[in-house]
């Protein structure tokens, strides 16, 4: 079992039914693991829309709304919906992609410290490095 499969199992155990978001190179392992899950991926055209859908799902159901994005600019598009969810007390989880800097031929291209950016707008922000 790889890290993505373990993460999907944890989401299933928490009762997650839907994930709103956009596929990208940096979250393909996660999406592959999602293929065998009962959790449904709701594709969106923009990360901000995915964030608002997840926040509103949380508001209406009381269950955690989960949204998914790629790295860098895709992840920063969650900022407004993160603030909206926090101010409204809506349960929401944001999952963003990231790539290892060492393996990237492009260096820091599109790599943003999303954890530090989201801390003021969320209850908890963490990057998973090792499983």
Identify the role of each PLM range:
Residues 1-131:
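N-terminal alpha/beta PP-like core and its mobile active-site loop of ThDP/TPP-dependent enzymes
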